[in-house]
A protein has these predicted regions:
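Short glycine-rich His-centered loop
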Residues: 1-7
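Active-site-proximal helix/loop segments of hydrolytic enzymes
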Residues: 8-169
């Protein structure tokens, strides 16, 4: 992971974000599985994906990008490459990944969070290549972005609103 402009490790901020989001989701009646319960856990992306596939209805990986422009939030979309989108399990799940990503961006945007471009960037990720559940990598800003407790609460509300929308609540 990257390091924020003030020297804070991304893993520290994503763990704080995950705890704030967990509280928001629990308050809305969701069950929440944290793939890691410390600021830095050595699990590769395949292990994280397998854990999520076997124990969850959706997998949301929280990140901040390594750029330095406070560019806003976006999700990593499944590349628009027919040979990639036709492989399993991608073929059976990429549309779910995309719908979840769009819902999260809409939730964030509705809560006043700055969105980068269209809110989507194509990326071939292990996470979406092997997921059998709706799965998304969401970038919540970059190394210049605000990650104060107040900002994390706004981000968590936006993400939770997106999850509600995705699941029809």
């Amino acid at each position: 992971g990257m390091t924020f402009s003030d020297g804070t490790a991304e893993s520290t901020v994503t763990f704080e974000m995950a705890k704030v989001l967990r509280e928001e989701l629990l308050s809305r009646g969701y069950n929440v599985l944290m793939i890691r319960d410390d600021s830095d856990v050595q699990l590769d992306n395949i292990a994280r994906t397998v854990i999520a596939n076997n124990n969850s209805n959706a997998h949301i990986a929280l990140h901040w990008d390594s750029t330095e422009s406070d560019k806003g939030a976006f999700y990593m979309g499944v590349p628009d490459v027919s040979s990639y989108r036709s492989m399993e399990p991608v073929a059976s799940n990429w549309q779910k990944h995309e719908a979840l990503g769009k819902a999260l961006i809409q939730g964030l945007s509705a809560n006043g969070v700055k969105i980068f471009g269209s809110g989507r960037m194509e990326m071939d990720l292990t996470q979406t290549s092997y997921s059998t559940i709706p799965s998304i990598d969401i970038e919540l800003g970059d190394k210049k972005s605000d990650y104060s407790k107040e900002k994390l609460k706004i981000l968590s509300k936006g993400i939770a609103d997106g999850i509600d929308s995705y699941f029809g609540f």
